[in-house]
């Protein structure tokens, strides 16, 4: 049996744009993609801290400092909103006990301020 666990999270990134006319996705700063370990076209869930919206899309490379929601997802955000961007992975129960997701914290300019592995002490 597999279980779905958090793989990586970018915590409280600032939305820099919303482009309704783009075909879809979230454009993410290359530095944040690298720090978090996200992959191009990887599915992500996005949680808007300002309005409570929760939705899924996929990752594309953006410009430095950019977090831009594109296509239909643009309806769920406004410039300046804070969002949490998460990806998940399917693991066996044994793998889940050892798994430590990556969490990336950013400032208001979407620059990495801290990167850490989440503690797995409760997964015994």
Swiss-Prot record:
Name its pathway.
Answer: Cofactor biosynthesis; (R)-pantothenate biosynthesis; beta-alanine from L-aspartate: step 1/1
Locate the Pyruvic acid (Ser) modifications and list their residues.
25
Q: Which residues cross the membrane?
A: none
Q: How is it modified after translation?
A: Is synthesized initially as an inactive proenzyme, which is activated by self-cleavage at a specific serine bond to produce a beta-subunit with a hydroxyl group at its C-terminus and an alpha-subunit with a pyruvoyl group at its N-terminus.
A GO CC annotation recorded here is: cytosol
Give the E.C. number(s): 4.1.1.11
- What is this protein called in UniProt? Aspartate 1-decarboxylase
- Source organism of this protein record: Bdellovibrio bacteriovorus (strain ATCC 15356 / DSM 50701 / NCIMB 9529 / HD100)
Question: Taxonomy-wise, where does this protein's organism fall, top ranks first?
Answer: Bacteria, Pseudomonadati, Bdellovibrionota, Bdellovibrionia, Bdellovibrionales
